[in-house]
């Protein structure tokens, strides 16, 4: 018997080991997969270049940098654009147009980093983009053209628009007015707040850099896509601002040497979203505007016909902005720049020596970056000829190829007579260096990738053996293994990663089809038609969930229930939303019934639910006003008029916290009383019911953090939950087993995530509820709110599972008591008897919670190992940064937060509280 | 029924024969017997525990048809595949009567009709028996017609089941419905022909307790095949055949044929 006890202990130890190894593997792998790029510290200075004189004189001294968020190239350049004035500038040569290639991830913060530093931001910046308060994403300490303009000390820096700039450059701007983009329904106010500052600033002559960042066009894209009826009017509005600034430059003396740059930070796809790397998303417009540029004689055709690939005029890299601005405005190129001076502007400098200087400075600066990255001093002296015959690394190859361009520069410097194409080899070399340094493939730390992989495989082995030891009979693990293995295989195909929801939908429907129809096994003679009647609502619920939000990549934006039935019928939506809140209210009141007197219970819970509901209504009025019906506006919002959204959200959170504390108080109080006879009647149910209170309180939190159109989904969840609960006490002792519940929970957690609009794309992270009740940015709070906002469904199912696990536990306790009463009848199975004897010796059976953790750990270990293997093997795949890396980040969220924190930590705590 | 309980609970301990015995003792009460139209006419072995695998008739015609028809179905499918990909609805519609004729021939020639003694070859013909195996009498034709009526009744339900498992609901209605009709004709028609509306037999089929044979094997294969047919749809290969419902139909046919052949040969009589 002591051996058996050891068996239980060893399975617990294996389980703990697996759960320790999972985060360890994730961290090791991440450090190898997202390598930390060495950043050169400090501000670049002009260093004397051998043989050159002073740096060439810059044609401009002031900069107006106007960013229009999501300004895709065709919005400016094509026939149906609203930028008529800008197009006339292109025709007259006063505007030099480009298509600036933006690398993935095409979201604002990494793009601004690329634009200002000239470097290619690491993929981790995406995470930091969400986690906007992170200090390490701040560029205040890095070398950027803003820092250089400030160091020039020829004027102040002013900024109006998206407050991402303020977060990236704290303390840099002398005058600033940041706008936030919480509500994408705001098309006008957010831009008006920028525009109203322009006339005054154009009259001021105390600044040398003015940054304007307009968000309205991006909002229109998110809301209505690139063909929204608001799009062209917004373009005309932006065109008007271009005209306003250009005319000021033309007419006002203190602005005559002003360079005006108009650009988008990224583009958008046909659905109006961005984040990935489709041509639409990676092709923003970029224009350099000034009357002085007419001298370049670059008069180009405009407008142009539509282009499928969004490439208009010549295409440059977004990072090329940094060295080009450095040359045009006369400051040293930022230290970590990988951009290449745009050669079209070279002819501004009439002397070849000046042109050579600028190119040479660019090359030398990139060589410094290469030397830092490769850890060698490749460019210090001439390389021995033999090592150039067979270069050992890409870096060496590059160093060898430097000879030719370097000779060209030398000749240009001394004024040799050369053909007009002399600069071409230099630019080609620079592009090559840029490509090499931007491609991160060479930066993987293979040993760490493999170490992480091995650790994850160990976690798989541990969790597998723990599950086999914990679960009996072992064959009940088969469905879980099939799911885990199929999922693991799927991770290697990019389209299955993009369309992961189909896997969960099909698996969930099949599994619930099995659960509802397994009663056929009990039915011996008669055809159990009633089972079909149970199966129908359950499967229909799952079908509704599947169709609620269209997610994934391929068919993103195609009709779904939200678009077809919810948005056109707001009355119907609010009926369902009201029903959801009403139902939660009912359950909340019921779970407190008998604990607190009705006169207190009822008003308190009503107040809490009403606060949550009015917050949701008020939030929707800001976020999606077209969804709010008159009834909700007049009846519910009017009597709480004046309360700000932050105050409303805080009221909800504080109320939830207080009621949760009360519920916890009841649990602890009843736990204490559980020992005495006095509370005997309540002993079985007391804390268990308080746990359901916490479950309902979480439901309110989940509703608060979910999009309004997703709220009715919780009614469907309730129906499925009710089915699972009824299956626990199915007749004939064939009730739901813990493993079956674990599998159901796993499937529903994933299916609900996708059903509520989640996907494996970074762009699908929903930030609309991330700032509820938060006025000052707080990483922890915003992080939690973001997580609950996106994983509302999965966390709901984790709560639900704990309550159901408690029910299973009590059912088994009951059956054990019954079984020990008439052991003779039940003891037909020798094994079972033995197991029972063992359990009695140990004073308890295997806790259902342990079995549940074994189930979720097994799947998590499999998924982590599979995603790592896919990322390692496909690290040179075209989609590694757009499909597999985002999947890795999602996998991290699922395994660290959803598995470890929610399914193990939170559920464990709740199960423990409820088991007294 | 108190006796059911020990049976279900002790399935692993008692050998199968014992289960069968205890079940048949439960079932041999006259009341329950009378309400069922059972697969066999023999009294003591009428209950579910002895639901026998369907045996293909031993006549030369039956044996020829048994092997020829799967080949013919495969050939038909391969011949029409390109047309199916470009124009699924008319192709499925036109193929329906052909497949129906195939299945009808198969049922009439090879399968024992419901109500007919199931496994004559195993036992001596009883004295009261009217027909010899292999004859296509009027009663078997009526059984076949009834089976086809039942198949068409069940097709809408199959359609809804497919929708519940993710088939498009608002679009592609005729695609899915025809696909369901094909699936029903392949997998359910033979079962209706051999079991009729015998609820015990259908409960056994639904509970995956029926022994494998050509009919049940075909059902399992067809449904699993159709289910697996959904797998390649999300792949980004952008092929024409990835369109709804080509892969589903392909899986259904492949699975059905495989299940039918394997169920009739290698796994005949085995249970899950």
UniProtKB/Swiss-Prot annotation, chain B:
Residues 32-48 have a biased composition (Low complexity). One of its GO terms (cellular component) is endoplasmic reticulum membrane. Residues 21-48 are annotated as: Disordered. Residues 21-31 have a biased composition (Polar residues). Pathway: Glycolipid biosynthesis; glycosylphosphatidylinositol-anchor biosynthesis. Pfam families: PIG-F (PF06699). GO terms for molecular function: mannose-ethanolamine phosphotransferase activity. InterPro entries: GPI_biosynthesis_protein_Pig-F (IPR009580). The chain crosses the membrane at residues 91-111, 145-165, 177-197, 215-235, 248-268. It is found in: Endoplasmic reticulum membrane. It comes from the Eukaryota. It is a multi-pass membrane protein. Keywords: Endoplasmic reticulum, GPI-anchor biosynthesis, Membrane, Transmembrane, Transmembrane helix. Belongs to the PIGF family. This is Glycosylphosphatidylinositol anchor biosynthesis protein 11. It comes from Neurospora crassa (strain ATCC 24698 / 74-OR23-1A / CBS 708.71 / DSM 1257 / FGSC 987). The gene is gpi-11.
